[in-house]
Every structure is written in structure tokens, then in C-alpha cells.
């Protein structure tokens, strides 16, 4: 799930995440087992690449960037111009879901073109006052339907929403809300 402060930020003003609670109740192994494809924005990917922590065995990783070069990052696939059609095609493949792992700008772009099916948010019991918002401006309106929730002992509130879709932008595959057991992929915002 994407960690957010109660006031709607996914990171502090300088990208800091020291306020995020690593709750032992959350089953991270089970969480990662739901995905066979990761989708990241450049700003989320770059610190991972510097730490040599970009990608997981058996999981395809795609990075949306207009500036990164494929030759510099052989363990991931860089998606430049036309990335939207590639993501749309990935969603039509059989397999597990796609994990949209940051950031806010990529989330906003995918939401705007109808390529996000589920939003899973972990609201941390903290107000940070400023930072990188979950949905950066210019934000769009998106109707959501609550599908599950959980309150953890740490005070984290986990919320899962299905996105009520409008028709996608011209040239992209229609998006359907899919169950996890569906053979086709679902794009899920989780972090």
C-alpha cells in the first residue's frame, strides 16, 4: 500500500520517509507475491538504482522516464515516449498484477488515462505539514469505491479502493476493474 500521512503526503519536502511506520503486522512476503511486474517513475527509481536495489528476482521492472538511458540500466526496462501504450499492453498480458511503486506524478498520469484499477493507501498516524502529495496538481477527480479496510495496532489505517473508470484516452485499451484471480493484470497503486 502507498504510505501517506494523515494530511495526504507520500514523502516529506526533500523526499524523506522517516515518518513511515514499518508495521510487523503487514505481510510483506504475501504482498510481493501478488505482483510479477513493477512500474516506477524516474524519481522513485533513481535512489534505488544508486543503492543497487532496483528490481527483484523474477519480477519485471519498468521505469517511466524521458531522460534515463536504457544502456545505463540493463536490469530494468526504461519506457520513454509512448510509455502509456506499453503499460496498456502490459495490462493485457496474463499473470499477476502490476505494482505502481511511485511516484505521485506517474500515479496522476495513469489515473488520468484510466490505467489504475485499485488504490491501496496506508494512512500513517502522523501529520507532516508539507511534502510530496499523493496526487500532485493538477489533480483530477476520480470516483473510488471502498473494497476493504483494516486498522493496525500501530495506528495505521489501511484502505483499499476500486477506481470507478471513465473511458480511457484515445488509442489506449479500455480498463476494466479486475478481480485478483483474473488472468489479466491490474494496475494497483501500492507503495
Task: Give names to the regions the model predicted.
Residues 1-191:
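Enzymes that bind and transform nitrogen-containing heteroaromatic metabolites
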Amino acid at each position: 500500500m502507498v504510505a501517506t500521512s494523515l494530511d495526504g503526503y507520500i514523502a516529506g519536502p526533500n523526499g524523506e520517509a522517516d515518518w513511515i511506520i514499518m508495521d510487523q503486522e503487514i505481510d510483506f512476503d504475501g504482498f510481493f507475491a501478488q505482483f510479477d511486474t513493477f512500474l516506477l517513475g524516474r524519481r522513485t527509481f533513481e535512489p534505488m538504482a544508486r543503492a543497487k536495489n532496483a528490481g527483484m528476482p523474477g519480477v519485471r521492472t519498468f521505469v517511466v522516464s524521458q531522460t534515463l538511458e536504457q544502456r545505463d540500466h540493463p536490469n530494468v526496462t526504461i519506457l520513454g515516449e509512448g510509455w502509456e501504450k506499453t503499460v496498456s499492453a502490459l495490462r493485457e498480458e496474463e499473470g499477476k498484477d502490476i505494482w505502481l511503486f511511485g511516484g505521485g506524478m506517474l500515479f496522476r498520469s495513469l489515473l488520468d488515462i484510466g490505467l489504475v484499477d485499485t488504490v491501496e493507501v496506508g494512512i500513517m498516524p502522523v501529520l507532516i505539514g508539507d511534502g510530496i502529495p499523493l496526487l500532485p496538481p493538477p489533480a483530477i477527480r476520480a470516483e473510488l469505491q471502498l473494497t476493504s479496510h483494516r486498522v493496525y495496532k500501530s495506528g495505521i489505517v489501511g484502505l483499499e479502493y476500486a477506481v470507478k473508470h471513465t473511458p480511457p484516452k484515445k488509442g489506449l485499451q479500455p480498463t476494466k476493474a479486475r478481480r485478483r484471480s483474473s488472468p489479466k493484470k491490474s494496475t494497483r497503486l501500492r507503495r
